[in-house]
Amino acid sequence: MDNHNSSHQLYKKAMALVLAGGRGSRLYNLTDTRAKPAVYFGGKFRIIDFALSNCLNSGIRRIGVVTQYKSHSLLRHLQRGWGFLRGELNEFIDLLPAQQRVDEEHWYRGTADAVYQNIDILRSYGPEYVIVLAGDHIYKMDYSIMLRDHAQSGYKCTVGCVEIAKEEAYAFGIMGIDENRKITSFIEKPKKNAPTIPGTTDRCYASMGIYIFNSDYLYDLLEEDITNKESSHDFGKDIIPRVVSENQALAHPFSMSCVPRGEGIQPYWRDVGTIDAFWEANLDLAANMPELNIYDKDWPVWTAQEQLPPAKFVPDRNGNHGVITNTLASGGCIVLGSEISKSLMFSKVRVLAGCKIDQCVIMPEVVVGENCRLKKVVIDKGCDIPAGMVIGEDPIEDAKNFYRTDKGVVLVTKKMIDELKEK
């Protein structure tokens, strides 16, 4: 059987489960009203669109999305933008909100518990393989390649991993592997002595939060874990170390299945879990040749499409023309005679005359008043920035009125603006 037919048969036997219930507390006020996977990204998308698009483009058409924290925005997005799969062809996105299905006592207590509480639904679909995905990372990956790698290996679990510098290991689950990619150790966020990639002293393999299990093996693991009172019911902390101890875990390097892939191509994967990382990943897209290609017709990023007119850039009432460079602008935006560089504007943003905007991420339905100066600012949905406001130039004022990171990125929300207007 050739690889194409083999992959086709495999993904027909697989179901993906996207874990999208996390708050993402390190994003601070950006997740006050929405779960992290529902946060806007890249000018028109939501973070979860990347994992879901990877499923679709990989041929995985049976998908469950597990939700919990402030899920309304996420559920609405999925209902409006992801309802095109055909149920009669056994294609679906099944929304799985926390509903105390098992003991009527607990909401989801960890990533493993979130899957366990939907174990009856999983079993009803009868997949041979379960692909467990984090819904809060930015990357493009062909899961069918990882699935084929898993099926051919004979292991009962395969863990997606990405190469990182050893000094970053403290923030990830780190795995040690042998020459055959068998995972020999797994340490969640090691403070020191992180295992390195064979043949290197300064590079590590970090878990991507992507796991493929033989379904029966997964069910057994979850049923055993739920009875362990010492467990935190988390894949990284509890399930994967158990699998490693049973010699059943294979490492799958991201470079094998990233999109695009090949010699000289640096795999692009970002955990946008902090304001700085979120800002940087968005601005990556404003580069002349961004590492993440969102224009790839062969691997599109799908999302909800609102019917909007094209973006418009016009002179102000005095005839002053604006200058727009290295900037992404979504539908419905209108900019009057302003200078904008290295920025992203989501849908229905209005920038009035005389503004200077540099390295900013501006979410939908924001109005920027006349003569504002904004630098390294993330502006949440629906903000009305008063005329003449300066943000990003005075660290003391920024920290007093908004949230400012150590790297100087300023987060502005509607609540912050409203409170500032009341002073």
Curated annotation (Swiss-Prot):
It comes from the Bacteria. Belongs to the bacterial/plant glucose-1-phosphate adenylyltransferase family. GO terms for molecular function: ATP binding; glucose-1-phosphate adenylyltransferase activity. Involved in the biosynthesis of ADP-glucose, a building block required for the elongation reactions to produce glycogen. Catalyzes the reaction between ATP and alpha-D-glucose 1-phosphate (G1P) to produce pyrophosphate and ADP-Glc. Transmembrane segments: none annotated. It is an enzyme of class 2 (transferase). GO terms for biological process: glycogen biosynthetic process. It comes from Francisella tularensis subsp. novicida (strain U112). The lineage of its organism: Bacteria, Pseudomonadati, Pseudomonadota, Gammaproteobacteria, Thiotrichales. Pathway: Glycan biosynthesis; glycogen biosynthesis. InterPro entries: ADP-Glc_PPase, ADP_Glu_pyroP_CS, GlgC_bac, GlmU/GlgC-like_hexapep, NTP_transferase_dom, Nucleotide-diphossugar_trans, Trimer_LpxA-like_sf. Keywords: ATP-binding, Carbohydrate metabolism, Glycogen biosynthesis, Glycogen metabolism, Nucleotide-binding, Nucleotidyltransferase, Transferase. PROSITE patterns: ADP_GLC_PYROPHOSPH_1, ADP_GLC_PYROPHOSPH_2, ADP_GLC_PYROPHOSPH_3. Homotetramer. It holds the Pfam family Hexapep_GlmU. Its EC number is 2.7.7.27. This is Glucose-1-phosphate adenylyltransferase. Gene3D superfamilies: Hexapeptide repeat proteins, Spore Coat Polysaccharide Biosynthesis Protein SpsA, Chain A. It catalyses: alpha-D-glucose 1-phosphate + ATP + H(+) = ADP-alpha-D-glucose + diphosphate. Alpha-D-glucose 1-phosphate binds at Y108, G173, E188, K189, S207. The keyword Nucleotidyltransferase applies.
